[in-house]
Amino acid sequence: MESRCKKGYFRLAVIGLSKAKDCWEKNACAVTFIGDGGTSEGDFHAGLNFAAVMEAPVVFICRNNGWAISTHISEQFRSDGIVVKGQAYGIRSIRVDGNDALAVYSAVCSAREMAVTEQRPVLIEMMIYRVGHHSTSDDSTKYRAADEIQYWKMSRNSVNRFRKSVEDNGWWSEEDESKLRSNARKQLLQAIQAAEKWEKQPLTELFNDVYDVKPKNLEEEELGLKELIEKQPQDYMMLKELIPNWILGIGTLALRYDFQETLFNGWHAIAELQQLKLKIKLNSLLNDQADTESLKAARNSALNVIQAMIIHLVLTLKGRFSLPLTEETVRFNEPIQLNQNMVKDGGYTAELFPIRKEEQGEVRR
């Protein structure tokens, strides 16, 4: 409902919706929104006339900020705003200060009551000021003064006006404000943490649940996207790295010393893991579940080799043992515990749980 032509179209659709609700719910009405630029579309006028004739319980809310993107209202129409257009079609019309939250609330409540009790349409024209740009591609300072924008942003700020009103009436206080901000921040952080745990949907989901039977042009677009991802995978990597930086750091450290061949095998496993990680990401994006499972198995195998390398590296650096690195060695060693609070030179300090005496002897034999 953002484009103007779609806004005009929905003027008609919402009228049908409002009449349909009469069949099963009497205490209800439909509400639709439009900007001052959208009122220049033909469907807006057809919608007003249709609603008036059908006596549809619908509330039309027009946000008149004086600009249709960069076109001023003086270049759109010569009438006294939008409210007179509703009157011309026999519709009760209200003009209200759209920057006053309490005034808007009062006007909408009155309009809804009229629409429901009298079964008739109502038009509300909210006179507002658009502080921001129309869109990210718009620079409103090219067609209006920056000082004007700053004045409305600071001196006529609608949020500040609302807060002053509720504080003057004793409905709000600085303590309430502090509690609200604290609770809102806490809830926001919790929501972000929960959202980060959700697994991202594959890009192929963009093409599902749009049509009952996927049309040919959509299939071609989906195929084109898959080909593009395979050619330029680096541009579509949206998941976190599967390999933490500390693994790469330890692998680099291993190359500085003359360690056994297993350490170099571990380094090669890191490189292999990088490739597997990339393939798993691509399969996740392309929703290729079968191949992903086999890749994950290969990834786990590479991780085992890397874990063995880390254990051997830590033991050697600490001078505790000089053992051949085998599956038994890895199996008898307890898992490495990474203490992320011990950060040095951008890397992590690896701490190793003690190995039990009897297990040490069995390994040595």
Swiss-Prot record:
Give the keywords, sorted: NADP, Oxidoreductase, Pantothenate biosynthesis
Metabolic or biological pathway, per its Swiss-Prot or TrEMBL entry: Cofactor biosynthesis; (R)-pantothenate biosynthesis; (R)-pantoate from 3-methyl-2-oxobutanoate: step 2/2
Say yes or no: keyword Membrane present: no
An example of a Pfam family matching this protein is: E1_dh
Can you tell me which residues the record assigns to a coiled coil? none
| The enzyme's E.C. designation | 1.1.1.169
Q: Which PANTHER family match?
A: 2-OXOISOVALERATE DEHYDROGENASE SUBUNIT ALPHA, MITOCHONDRIAL
Q: Which family does it belong to?
A: Belongs to the ketopantoate reductase family.
> Which protein, by its recorded name, is this?
Putative 2-dehydropantoate 2-reductase
Organism per entry: Arabidopsis thaliana (Mouse-ear cress)
